Structure formats: structure tokens, C-alpha cells
Amino acid sequence: MKTDIEIAQSVELQPIVDVVKKVGIDYDDLELYGKYKAKLSFDKIREVEKNPVGKLILVTAINPTPAGEGKSTITIGLADALNKIGKKTMIAIREPSLGPVMGIKGGAAGGGHAQVLPMEDINLHFTGDMHAITTANNALSALIDNHLHQGNALGIDQRRIIWKRVVDLNDRALRHVTVGLGSPVNGIPREDGFDITVASEIMAILCLATDIEDLKKRLANIVIGYRYDRTPVYVRDLEVEGALALVLKDAIKPNLVQTIYGTPAFVHGGPFANIAHGCNSVLATSTALRLADYTVTEAGFGADLGAEKFLDIKTPNLPTSPDAVVIVATLRALKMNGGVAKDALTEENVEAVRAGFANLKRHVENIRKFGIPAVVAINEFVSDTEAEVATLKELCAEIGVPVELASVWADGAEGGVTLAETVVKTIAEEPAHYTRLYDNDLSIEEKIEKIVTEIYRGSKVNFEKKAQTQIREIVKNSWDKLPICMAKTQYSFSDNPASLGAPENFEITIRELVPKLGAGFIVALTGDVMTMPGLPKRPAALNMDVAADGTAIGLF
């Protein structure tokens, strides 16, 4: 059996200029990065704004195993299948972070015969967007430290700077650092730290900005810290939003690539869903909606994280809301949520599928709360048995949710045809009536309680003393009408990653609240969630290499 990278490298790529002609994009609309990658010009983005808006399909998942459940694979395979049945379709997904690529995932461009290509480029440096975001973020850090060194005219309290440096790697040693050591010429000594690039507010801003002017406005609104009198300091006070926008002027343009089957795909932006809002860029999604009849997009991790944030944070910035939500489930994840140990997930266990179904059922119920029809996609694995599949289909029928087996990893577009037909039928027969979970005018506490009690099904929210102080500060500064972006483990509805399935009557503790004024939301940190991940005992990097001819080895 071929590996993902072997399949990808066996495909004869089409020039990107030919791929995008299918959706009305011409050569002059592109800024090429070689033959197979391009950015879309702002002229074309503005030109298509007058076009009618197509149908939007959001792909999410149940609470995953550490290896993931194939959301990107299903997203890509579904789009290929929609094109196969005659529906003009585009993809809009996130670009991978090098941290997880080198860490546990080894790649994030789909899998098997449902991949975006060239996968090696996408998984590594791609068009340089991650580096531009990293540079803009760290340029701001350098400008803050220079301001302190040059006399601190703004009266910034160096103990209350909340802006951190970033790097696009998993590096736990950088979580807490001290800068400015050595001598007075090296700046003002202070405590600092690094986040992973995809947790940077600049990443979120890039993914929510609608044009260069909106980008500058959002950058100007970033809160970097506080003065000695506790008043906030914004990027606009440093007068550097223009310089930061300049660094990002190309990164904000959506990237175009192709699938194995030649479906045009936007791959742009990559915030994590457990520590950020977990969605690709508004620009890419909005543009795809105006170029194609169907746009398939995804939101990170389970529906409790990515989908909730897509619907409460991203959707209000889009020209339409999702017409259907596809919830990806695997029998191995259902069995894990049903109490089976990780080393026994490939063994048949119908009762564990029944027990784990409570997790999937809750996600279906939650999507319906937003007024959107759900479809379940079973991402097929070779270890699945007929009895397990039949049981899952029976359970889905009991709650009235359509379900289809998808074999896109093994069979490509053909393996997603029944899923595509079911999604199209669902959209036609069950019109969506989108509603947000909460009103932004509610208090910070009320919005968090809504998410915890209605989506997670917890019974109570506890706010640590630090969080209570931060809420008072947020209210004092009139920031309390922003939506909430929960930072929580992806493995459980609760803030305890070991509490699998469908836990109830648990309490969630909010330990910290971070205002992201540029992005336009407040991050609520729970449990032990880290904004700088660490590497596993055996990183995927140990299996990677490059051949003498430059061919990548070991990505998957």
C-alpha cells in the first residue's frame, strides 16, 4: 500500500493556471509561485464580490483520537466527489503549521487519494505566509522592546506586557524566557515567552481581515500591554500598524493549489482550534463562495471547538452561513469515546461503538441548535467491520441524521459520491436557518456559561481570581461585547482530556482571559491548554529526510 507522500508524488500535476480556469480565474488574476502554486490578486477578489453567493458546506468532527479523524481528507474528497457529480465546487481550508508537521501529525494536506498538492510544499514553507506572520509578530515585539529601551514615552509597564514572540514550531523550552539580559545596551530585562505562530493574534487577524485597510485597522487595535496607570497600550499608540501591514501585504492574499483530481483549492491561514478560532481565512472562503456553486470548508478539531467558533466568530464575517454541516466520525474514535484503550481500537467492538455514539449524538444536537442540518460521514478505515458500520448507521437513523460511508482515502472522488449526493439532497430539502448561540451583548460570564452549558453540557463555570480580575478590566475598557474564543482540550467536551464520551454535570474552570481586540474576540483559557505545544517522545521529524535529487521523504 502506498503512503500519502508516495501517492502525492505519483500524480502528474496540472499547471495551476489551467486548474483555476474551471472557476473563472485567468492567468492575469494570479501571482505565481512556480507552476503549481499561486496567490489570487486583490483585483480579482474585488471583481467577484458582485457575483452571487454559492452554497457553503462546513466539515467538522467528533472529539478525535490523537491521530485525527480525517476531517481534511473528507473535506477534500467531498469536494472532488461534488465536482464528479457535476457541481462546480471549490475547497477553502487551512494551511499546516510546521509544529505539528514535525511533531505528531507529519503533515496536514489530506490523505490517500484525497489530498491537496503539491503536499510537500504545502506542509513545509508553501508561499511563505507563516514566515510573514511570524516576522510581523516578532517585529512588533522588537518595536516594543525598542520603545522601552529608548525612554518609554508611553509609560508601558514592562511587567504587564501581554504580547509574546512566536515561532512556527513546537518548542516547550521557549514558553517562558527572559529577554534584555547582558548589559544596558541589550535593552530592558523583562520576562517574555513564545507562542506557536498559529496562536498569534496576527494569524487570527489575517484570517478575519477583508482587505488591506481592514488588516491595518485590526493591527492598530491589538492590545500589547498596559501602562503603569493600568490603561491599555495599543499598536496604534506605537504607530507601527502600517509597517506590520507592509510585512503582511502578500500573505493576506489567498493561496491557490489543486487536489489530486484537479479541484481548485484555497489553502490560506492556519489558526489552531483549541487555542485560537480554528478556521481558514474569510477572504479565501468568501471568494470561493463567489467563484463556485459549492464551497467545502473545515473547522479544526471537534465540533465543540472548531464548528462552534466557525459559527459564532467567523460566520458573522462571511456573506452567508453554512447550508449544511458534515460531521466526520470514525469507528476508532467512537470506540475510544466508548472506553476502549488506544491499543485495542482496531478490534471489533460493537458495544463500544454504541457507547461512544453518545459523543457523536451530542455533536449532531449542537449543530442543530445553530439551525443547520447535519450529515454524518463515516471515514472508512480498513479495520472497520460490517457489524460496526451497520450499528452506527442504525444509531444515526434513530436520531434522524443522514449518514454515509466515505472511502475517499482509498478510492478518491468515487469513494465520496454517495456522501456528496446526500449532502446536496440535504441542502435542497432542509433549508438552514442559522442562528448564533449567544448575543454579544451578554456579559463575558454569560457568554462563557452559554458555551459551557449548551455546547459542552457542563453544569457550572468557575472563574479563578486572575480571570475575575481580567473580567473587571475587560468591562472597564468596554471590551465585553466581543465574542468568546474558548481555549480547551480537543479530546473532551470538558476541560479534562481524559474525560471522553459525553460527560455531564462537570465544572469548567476559566484560569485566564486574553483580549484580542484586533481579531475581535476574547480568549478564555481553560485547563492545561498551552499556546506553545511541546514535541512527543518520538516526533514525526525522526522519519523525515530529503533525497539527493531534492525529493521529500517521510511526510504523511
Curated annotation (Swiss-Prot):
The keyword Transit peptide does not apply. Its EC number is 6.3.4.3. Signal peptide: none annotated. InterPro entries: Formate_THF_ligase, Formate_THF_ligase_CS, P-loop_NTPase. SUPFAM superfamilies: P-loop containing nucleoside triphosphate hydrolases. CDD domains: FTHFS (cd00477). GO terms for molecular function: ATP binding; formate-tetrahydrofolate ligase activity. It catalyses: (6S)-5,6,7,8-tetrahydrofolate + formate + ATP = (6R)-10-formyltetrahydrofolate + ADP + phosphate. GO terms for biological process: tetrahydrofolate interconversion. It holds the Pfam family FTHFS. The keyword ATP-binding applies. It comes from the Bacteria. Belongs to the formate--tetrahydrofolate ligase family. This is Formate--tetrahydrofolate ligase 2. It comes from Streptococcus sanguinis (strain SK36). The gene is fhs2.
